[in-house]
Amino acid sequence: KADLGKGNEYTFAVALDRTACREGHIEIVGAGPGDPDLISIRGRQMLEKADLILYAGSLVPKELTLCAKAGATVRSSADMNLEEQFALMKEFYDKGLFVVRLHTGDPCIYGAIQEQMNYFDQYGMDYHITPGISSFQAAAAALYSQFTIPEKVQTIILTRGEGRTPMPEKEQLHKLAQSQSTMCIFLSAG
């Protein structure tokens, strides 16, 4: 019963359709820089409730998946192509289950999520992104360093060196360095 004012009480009835199925959901989770202690609280919560955890086995430590609930499917994507990954996620999604796609670092920085989001959008699949701590942040902490210093440098450039994927001409490292900003260079060891 609810009182809608002026002493009038009303009773509301709610009917639930037992045949209705729960909609699936996909959570793209940033695993952080590799230390299981550095995953976000929300990221860990998503892992704990997932029915499927699909993680980048060549990059994400398996220890991050140890918090999976009993009965959850935990699978490395290292030996899967994109079509196989999508098929597995869609299979769980179509059953109304909760899927976590676990990526390294922050999935929005040099991640491979754009193709996945395009796929999810194409099939009308509900998804969300849980950011992660990026390796550049962990590196600063490990080095007891600060990337910005008042009146010295207030800009941070996140970039990568040229490799198999060429850099746009205007983003060549020597041109970016001319700004004398702090530069965090990803994917360039070796």
Region locations from a protein language model:
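Short, glycine-rich nucleotide/cofactor-binding loops
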Residues: 28-38, 163-164
